[in-house]
């Protein structure tokens, strides 16, 4: 076995199937997951945790120690992968300007443990602690606290028998959720190691790897197919779950259930546009009014009219923006690109075409989301201009080679279509 993995959240059924097949031992399953796979709940400590990102369930976080990175890239071939350059629970020292590396540090402690990696550009610290997968130990008021997942009174009393002697010596102990699944002897030895590490300031090897994966629509559809092999699952299950949790559960009680009504309900008169960059950061583009839509069991197509105001020039096209200019753009669940046609607000003449290459767009309530693949194409006065290919190569550190190759393949396909006057 490669390691023990705990999986939580809306992707749990599909990911349990996938990581089991990759020779990981699945532990601490929910009763529902255990029953779906006709297994007993495996009450053992986890080395790695995979779960929904609490701020956006379109992303997952993976944390712990083990050789899972390559498998993550292979499982999520068409998604963005961010690995924290600073380990979770590692001990760092901030400089005088309250930064560490290129990241801002809050609060500005001289030394502390990382309790939030810098996925948003900021490291959050707490006072220095010795940390293992079972517990945290540090000098303080001599109290014991528990993970929110340790809520059984008997279990808390069991753990207190070990931490109380340390409390009397002035150590704080926080029990992590894994502690429930370890023996008293394992926990006693672990606390002894943590005290030694804390007193000797031996934090060099402390910390857990942290990954944030922004899931694409193609990878969500793959998870749909995996889940479908285990339990009734409609197409777009994992996408729809982001907006309609209970409604999807209700729909799937009917084996002939169709996602069409839920897909239609996601489309409002005006749609926002969430354009996600390779490092996982979202840019909100000017949204647009829906002027045409088509939804069926196989997918969806939405055409927007976006009003373009302000000064400056059209990116890639190079023509000046004038009052009343507008963009007509189609988002199609089957296509890895969107064609923006920019028109003059004065005489409705075509100013130019800009093609954004991305993963196929997904729908959330009133919003279109896709992963931007950096490389784009502009058509200016019959000239074909390939934009930002160097950015694709630079940002490939966040992508599986399959996604990089797909972006280049789509760009070449579009160039051929333009040259043959077959651009639709």
Swiss-Prot record:
It is an enzyme of class 3 (hydrolase). The keyword Hydrolase applies. Its EC number is 3.1.26.-. InterPro entries: DUF402 (IPR007295), FomD-like_sf (IPR035930), Ntdp-like (IPR050212), RNA-bd_FAU-1 (IPR016730). Transmembrane segments: none annotated. The keyword Nuclease applies. SUPFAM superfamilies: FomD-like. One of its GO terms (molecular function) is RNA endonuclease activity, producing 5'-phosphomonoesters. Keywords: Endonuclease, Hydrolase, Nuclease, RNA-binding, rRNA processing. This is Probable ribonuclease FAU-1. It comes from Saccharolobus islandicus (strain L.S.2.15 / Lassen #1).
């Amino acid at each position: 076995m490669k390691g023990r993995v705990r999986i939580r959240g809306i992707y749990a059924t599909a990911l349990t199937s996938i990581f089991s097949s990759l020779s990981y031992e699945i532990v601490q399953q929910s009763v529902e997951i255990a029953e779906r796979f006709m297994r007993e709940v495996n009450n053992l400590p986890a080395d790695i945790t995979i779960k929904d990102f609490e701020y956006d369930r379109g992303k997952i976080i993976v944390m712990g120690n083990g050789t899972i990175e390559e498998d993550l890239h292979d499982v999520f071939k068409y998604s963005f992968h961010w690995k924290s350059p600073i380990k979770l629970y590692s001990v760092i020292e901030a400089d005088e300007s309250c930064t560490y590396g290129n990241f801002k540090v809050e609060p500005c402690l001289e030394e502390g443990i990382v309790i939030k990696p810098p996925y948003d550009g900021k490291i959050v610290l707490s006072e220095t602690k010795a940390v293992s997968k079972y517990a945290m130990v540090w000098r303080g008021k001599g109290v014991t606290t528990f993970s929110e997942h340790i809520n059984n009174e008997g279990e808390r009393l069991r753990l207190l028998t070990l931490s109380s002697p340390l409390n009397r010596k002035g150590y704080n102990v926080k029990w992590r959720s894994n502690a429930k699944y370890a023996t008293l002897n394992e926990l006693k030895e672990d606390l002894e190691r943590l005290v030694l590490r804390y007193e000797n300031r031996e934090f060099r090897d402390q910390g857990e790897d942290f990954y944030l994966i922004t899931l694409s629509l193609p990878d969500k559809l793959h998870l749909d197919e995996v889940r479908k092999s285990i339990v009734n699952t409609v197409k777009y299950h994992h996408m729809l779950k982001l907006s309609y949790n209970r409604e999807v559960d209700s729909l799937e009680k009917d084996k002939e259930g169709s996602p069409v009504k839920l897909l239609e309900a996601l489309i409002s008169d005006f749609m926002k546009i969430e354009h996600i960059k390779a490092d996982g950061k979202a840019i909100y583009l000017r949204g647009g009014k829906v002027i045409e839509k088509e939804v069926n069991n196989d997918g969806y197509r939405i055409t927007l009219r976006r009003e373009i105001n302000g000064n400056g020039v059209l990116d890639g096209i190079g023509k000046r923006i004038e009052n009343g200019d507008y963009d007509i753009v189609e988002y199609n669940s089957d296509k890895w690109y969107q064609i923006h046609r920019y028109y003059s607000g004065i005489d409705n003449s075509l100013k130019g075409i800009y093609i954004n290459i991305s993963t196929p767009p997904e729908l959330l309530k009133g919003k279109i989301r896709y992963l931007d693949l950096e490389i784009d194409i502009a058509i200016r006065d019959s000239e074909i201009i390939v934009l930002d290919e160097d950015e694709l190569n630079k940002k490939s550190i966040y992508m599986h080679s399959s996604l990089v190759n797909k972006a280049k393949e789509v760009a070449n396909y579009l160039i051929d279509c333009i040259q043959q006057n077959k651009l639709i």
